[in-house]
UniProtKB/Swiss-Prot annotation:
Belongs to the glycosyl hydrolase 2 family. Beta-mannosidase B subfamily. GO terms for molecular function: beta-mannosidase activity. Its EC number is 3.2.1.25. The keyword Transmembrane helix does not apply. Gene3D superfamilies: Galactose-binding domain-like (2.60.120.260), Glycosidases (3.20.20.80), Immunoglobulins (2.60.40.10). InterPro entries: Beta-gal/glucu_dom_sf, Beta-mannosidase-like_N2, Beta-mannosidase_GH2, Galactose-bd-like_sf, Glyco_hydro_2_Ig-like, Glycoside_hydrolase_SF, Ig-like_fold, Mannosidase_ig. The gene is mndB. Exoglycosidase that cleaves the single beta-linked mannose residue from the non-reducing end of beta-mannosidic oligosaccharides of various complexity and length. Prefers mannobiose over mannotriose and has no activity against polymeric mannan. Is also severely restricted by galactosyl substitutions at the +1 subsite. This is Beta-mannosidase B. Keywords: Carbohydrate metabolism, Glycosidase, Hydrolase, Polysaccharide degradation. Pathway: Glycan metabolism; N-glycan degradation. It is an enzyme of class 3 (hydrolase). The keyword Phosphoprotein does not apply.
Length: 844
């Protein structure tokens, strides 16, 4: 009995423009997976589309069809074994031919395919595998033109994209280029076997007291002959040590066992405990020979989405292992427009950055792709909760029978693939499709519960989100929460702040509110909000080649910002708050200050509301990352270089964070008058599960002199409420008694150490003289590649930002420094002889 074997078909490929019939048209492909844009670059037929205006010169690639070909030899095949040609992903309209005969046609990028080629490979020797990738943009347009009755309402990109099951951002988005890829975007291989384990999954029951857990494991077997003589040997282990073992026979090609685990190690999100991962393994055996084995990492945990009526409306927050978790985190877009270029190492670095930023949840956005296994593995291992959108975004999708069939296959395949990951806590039907329904005035009668009726309306996609997808999740992953859309709340208008989740874009988009009042604009769970900022100069210098183009309004910089009206919006928020500048380096920094302040005001206020009966259950900023070097809402750029906002968010999400703020006075209104008094508030937010005692101080320091304008307030033995908010005090600033501008500087000590700081500044910054701060940055110790810097100032300093240098990490940045409160920053990665990191602060 031959064991399972597989042969990757990753090398030996060539490709060409499908229309070019000349023999010299064929070009070598370095490695598969790949897409045509990558392979054209490798053959010097295409300039890097991420530099300058090269994206425009690459547009021709989008309109072409491409053919890939390889020659391989038939592998050794034992009697009774089959040969399967397995494709994990074809982008998108693919016709696969083996020795000239069509063996597969695919039109869904998000599906895997398995083709039995045993008979086709009966002959020994060489065999030719050829794949034609038809132009997706052309096919999309043709499909749209065939259905003139459908309302193709959408945001972003060509509405025809909705006819095709392909990453929607490939049609261009307001943060990315228009690069429509084609190719073998995931692994292709030959598998040879008489029997194999085709699926392994578990169902976990955790007792309410967490003292026991029941792990039911299931293995599905693909075999050509009877499975009566096979057995499945299951092993459950933790950190390499056996927990339980059991052998099972197969019934209807499925084997299952149940393990009772005592004192289970639970999987927790980062900051709440260890993300313990068990390994479930199964070995398929016949006549004491191992035929095939599979193993997966799983977690023992419960995950609930709590939606209950309360005085604010209806709650929306996550409860993990019985603990309410404020989900501070980010939205995720694909990390590259050329998806096969993203390595497992790069995925892990992104998730490591999230953990370093104290972020708990990542939302996989519905206009990209179901991510690579290594993405979810990193989330599992590092304790990051995943909000997983299905791949529908910003549109009214058609529901032709053949499209619904493809979508159902897509959902089945991906939920099967992903369901063992403990990090995934919610599946969500779409991104902003209900907002498209609202804006286009499409029919949505929430009280009509007949799915067949939905298909007859001008919003037929409701059938996908409220019937098809939840049915798949219920069948394949019944313990995972399903939510119809983002944003969505019980069929109400998507801007309703009392129910469901909310995309709050009235800062930046919409009414362009002041970011200082961001916290008043939120809902029960703020799953999108953002503010643009330029990336660091090192990133700009990558895509801006000419020195003459290095000024804020240059054509190439505009070209690399795809957001509608970006210049007006950036300018508005800059001139309202800061003294503007025309040199690029300062301008870049100023946009970053605005982004950092915006994120701070939002997160800080919404986390405070967590303590008000879970008024706000979480905040996922738009967006964590970029898909190319650009100017966008990302808080970390394409090259994994954090912007100042990354650090501002990390501080607000500390296990214990202190907050201080005075009421916002809007100087931009007609006939604005200086306020006679201003109220202020001081509070502590904690995600710890037990009460903590601390000492809190509030100082009132002159911006101009650095001296106290009134006596500090000190409170000892403050009891800090666990997993909530502790309101410390409210006060009033008398502007007649203290007329000079001053900051409110709060510090919190726990166990004798400063654990949190916050500084509230007079607004707007443009009215303040922030020159001559008396800032000093001194190296106080050095050990190996680690340095400690002590930062002090004679006058309050706003937003001290350290240079982001590749391979170097700073423990904090975008810091406010006040007199009498020196702060220490750890720099890791500097070698002997390296220049010290540069830094910049507001008013420098």
């Amino acid at each position: 009995m031959a064991a399972f074997s597989q042969y990757p078909l990753s090398t030996g490929w060539s490709f060409k423009d499908s229309d070019d019939q000349s023999p010299e048209a064929w070009m070598p492909v370095p490695v598969v997976p790949s897409v045509a844009h990558q392979d054209l670059q490798a053959n010097q037929k295409l300039k890097n589309p991420y530099i300058g205006f090269n994206e425009l010169d690459a547009r021709w690639v989008n309109d072409k069809s491409w053919t890939y070909r390889t020659v391989f030899q038939k592998p050794a095949v034992a009697a009774g074994s089959s040969i399967i040609l397995a494709f994990d992903g074809l982008d998108t309209f693919a016709t696969v031919k083996l020795d000239g005969s069509v063996i597969l046609q695919s039109d869904n990028m998000f599906l895997a395919h398995r083709v039995d080629v045993t008979k086709a490979l009966e002959a020994e020797g060489d065999h030719v595998l050829e794949i034609d990738f038809d132009c997706a943009m052309r096919r999309a347009r043709e499909l749209r033109e065939k259905d003139t009755k459908h309302n193709w309402a959408s945001f972003n990109g060509d509405p025809a994209r909705m006819a095709v099951r392909k990453a929607q951002y490939h049609w261009g988005w307001d943060w990315g280029p228009l690069l429509s890829t084609a190719g073998i975007w995931r692994e292709v291989r030959l598998e040879v076997y008489s029997a194999k384990i085709s699926d392994l999954w578990t169902e976990v029951e955790l007792a309410s007291d967490h003292q026991t857990a029941r792990v039911s494991a299931f293995a599905e077997v693909d075999a050509a002959d009877s499975v009566d003589s096979y057995k499945a040997s299951f092993l459950l282990s933790l950190h390499g040590k056996e927990v339980a073992r059991e052998v099972a026979t197969l019934k209807d090609k499925v084997a299952n066992v149940t393990f009772d685990v005592t004192q289970p190690s639970l999987w927790w999100p980062n900051g709440y405990g260890d993300p313990a991962l068990y390994e479930i393994s199964v070995s398929l055996e016949k006549e004491d020979c191992e035929i095939h084995s599979v193993s997966k990492k799983i977690g023992i945990r419960t995950a609930e989405l709590i939606q209950q009526p309360d005085r604010h409306g209806k709650s929306f927050f996550f409860r993990i292992n019985g603990v309410d978790v404020f989900c501070g985190g980010s939205c995720w877009i694909p990390a590259d427009n050329l998806l096969p270029s993203i390595t497992a190492e790069r995925y892990r670095k992104w998730i490591e950055l999230m953990v370093a930023g104290r972020q708990v949840m990542i939302r996989v956005w519905g206009g990209g792709c179901y991510e690579d296994d290594s993405f979810y593995q990193a989330c599992d291992e590092l304790g990051v909760l995943v909000w997983q959108d299905f791949m529908f975004g910003c549109g009214n999708y058609p529901t032709w029978p053949e499209l619904l069939e493809s979508i159902e296959k897509e959902a089945n395949y991906n939920v099967r693939r992903l369901r063992h990951h403990p990090s995934i806590v919610v599946y969500v039907g779409n991104n902003e499709d209900y907002q498209v329904q609202e804006s286009a005035g499409l029919v949505y009668d929430y009280e009509d519960k007949n799915p067949e009726n939905w298909l007859k309306t001008d919003f037929p996609a409701r059938y996908i989100y409220e019937k098809l997808l939840p049915s798949v999740v219920e069948k394949l992953s019944p313990k995972t929460v399903y939510h119809p859309g983002s944003p969505w709340g019980d069929g109400k208008i998507t801007s309703d702040p009392t129910v469901g989740d909310m995309h709050q874009w009235n800062v930046w988009h919409g009414t362009q509110e002041k970011y200082q009042i961001f916290d008043t604009l939120g809902g029960r769970f703020n799953s999108e909000f953002g503010m643009e900022a330029f990336p660091h100069m090192s990133t700009i210098e990558y895509f801006v080649e000419n020195e003459a183009d290095k000024y804020p309004q240059s054509h190439v910089l505009d070209f690399h910002n795809k957001a509608d009206g970006h210049e007006r919006r950036i300018a508005t928020y800059l001139v309202e708050n800061l003294r503007t500048a025309t040199d690029l380096e300062t301008y870049v920094y100023l946009t970053q200050v605005v982004q950092a302040e915006t994120m701070m005001f939002g997160y800080r206020g919404w986390r405070r509301q967590w303590g008000d009966e879970r008024h706000c259950g979480g905040a996922l900023l738009w967006q964590l990352n970029d898909c190319w070097p650009t100017i966008s809402w990302a808080i970390v750029d394409y090259f994994l270089r954090p912007k100042p906002a990354f650090y501002a968010v990390a501080r607000v999400l500390k296990p214990i964070a202190v907050g201080v703020r005075r009421e916002h006075h809007d100087w931009s209104v007609t006939h604005a008058q200086p306020p006679k008094t201003s109220k202020y508030e001081l509070w502590i937010a904690s995600s710890l599960q037990k009460e903590t005692v601390g000492t809190i101080e509030l100082r009132f320091l002159s911006v101009n002199t650095g001296l106290d304008v009134r006596a500090p307030i000190l409170r000892d033995n403050v009891k800090i409420v666990p997993n909530g908010t502790t309101n410390i005090l409210e006060g009033v600033i008398d502007h007649k008694a203290q007329p000079e501008p001053h900051v409110l500087a709060a510090r919190l000590w726990v166990d004798g150490e400063v654990t949190a700081r916050d500084v509230d500044w007079p607004q707007p910054f443009k009215y303040l003289d922030l020159s001559d701060r008396g800032l000093e940055v001194n190296k106080v110790s050095e050990s190996g590649n680690e340095q400690k810097l002590l930062i002090t100032a004679k006058k309050p300093v706003k937003c001290l930002v350290f240079e982001e240098r590749d391979g170097i990490r700073v423990s904090d940045s975008a810091m406010d420094i006040v007199p009498g409160d020196g702060q220490t920053v750890t720099v890791t990665g500097l070698k002997a002889g390296d220049a010290p990191l540069k830094y910049k602060y507001l008013g420098q």
